[in-house]
């Protein structure tokens, strides 16, 4: 494959058995582009949507990665593991209760909305300058603070009373939600313990499973028609169109006036010209006027892949 001039986002399908870093490394080789990063780690055993940023779009990862996610997962009841998933060692077992659909609705209700969740030991959260998974490898458990996360939807997809220990659920949640911890906490609520069996990420923001590309298809040829432009990838942000007479000022990093009062301090805004992203900025209040202060100004973005 010849070197490509691509900038934007690709929606890749991560297979189980590969790390997210492995997927990025392979994409770099296939696309012959060093500037590639992923938008949110998936565990090696997990599969599903793993969007990648290419070229200058890597500067936007933090703004695109912080969107809501959706997952399908298997909850296995009756066993607690030290990793909260099927790869861990079973540390406790319990009898699985027989539950009706109404019972399940009552069980899941407290997990909807904003909840507090304690990060698992096998996570990349830093405590005392070290990642939690580094402590876990040494057999050390450290105290962690609970964090607020939001779950907008949690529904049962499959439940068979003949095999009550295995339940498939769909979850839509905020970035930073640990599905393995959700499975563990549901098991704790039922009193029998539980852990995550398998996990598929079905959506990350506007990137969905049905539109994802396999690494095999990526190897077959240039995926230019599959590129999601930075302007499109930031669709969750308000847009400010820049007039022709303000382009020079924007290139020098000068603030642009905002219309109206429906802004909040620090709010991110995509700054564009005819839906070509020029910069991203933040709303600031100055002299009773709202302005958009550019934070990241781009050159050639969204033009090379055309």
Curated annotation (Swiss-Prot):
Record keywords: Isomerase, tRNA processing
Function: Responsible for synthesis of pseudouridine from uracil-55 in the psi GC loop of transfer RNAs.
Domain of life from the UniProt record: Bacteria
Family the entry assigns: Belongs to the pseudouridine synthase TruB family. Type 1 subfamily.
Catalytic activity: uridine(55) in tRNA = pseudouridine(55) in tRNA
EC numbers, comma separated: 5.4.99.25
GO MF annotation: an example: tRNA pseudouridine(55) synthase activity
HAMAP family the record matches: TruB_bact
PANTHER family cross-referenced by the UniProt entry: PSEUDOURIDYLATE SYNTHASE TRUB1 (PTHR13767:SF2), TRNA-PSEUDOURIDINE SYNTHASE (PTHR13767)
Descriptive protein name: tRNA pseudouridine synthase B
Broadest EC class assigned to this enzyme: isomerase
Classification via InterPro entries: PsdUridine_synth_cat_dom_sf, PsdUridine_synth_N, tRNA_psdUridine_synth_TruB, TruB_C
């Amino acid at each position: 494959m010849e070197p490509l001039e691509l900038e934007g986002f690709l929606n890749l399908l991560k297979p189980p058995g590969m790390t997210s870093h492995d997927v990025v490394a392979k994409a770099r080789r296939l696309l012959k582009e060093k500037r590639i990063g992923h938008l949110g780690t998936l565990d090696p055993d997990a599969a599903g949507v793993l969007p990648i940023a290419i070229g200058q779009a890597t500067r936007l990862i933090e703004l695109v990665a912080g969107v809501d996610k959706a997952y399908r997962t298997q909850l296995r009841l009756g066993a607690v593991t030290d990793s909260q998933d099927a790869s861990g060692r079973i540390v406790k077992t319990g009898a699985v209760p027989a539950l009706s659909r109404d019972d399940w609705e009552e069980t899941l209700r407290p997990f909807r909305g904003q909840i507090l969740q304690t990060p698992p030991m096998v996570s990349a959260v830093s405590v005392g300058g070290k990642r939690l998974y580094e402590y876990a490898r040494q057999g050390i458990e450290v105290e962690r603070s609970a964090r607020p996360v939001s779950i907008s939807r949690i529904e049962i997809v499959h439940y068979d009373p003949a095999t009550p220990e295995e339940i498939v659920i769909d979850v839509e949640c905020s970035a930073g939600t640990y599905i393995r911890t959700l499975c563990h906490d549901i098991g704790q609520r039922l009193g029998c313990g539980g852990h995550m069996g398998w996990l598929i990420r079905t959506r990350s923001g506007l990137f969905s499973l049905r539109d994802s590309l396999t690494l095999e298809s990526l190897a077959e040829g240039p995926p230019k028609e599959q590129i999601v432009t930075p302007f499109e990838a930031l669709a969750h942000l308000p847009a400010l169109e820049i007039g022709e007479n303000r382009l020079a000022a924007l290139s020098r990093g000068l603030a642009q006036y905002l219309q109206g009062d429906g802004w909040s301090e620090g709010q991110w805004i995509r700054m564009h010209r005819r839906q070509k992203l020029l910069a991203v900025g933040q709303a600031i209040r100055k002299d009773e006027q709202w302005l958009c202060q550019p934070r990241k100004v781009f050159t050639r973005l969204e033009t090379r892949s055309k």
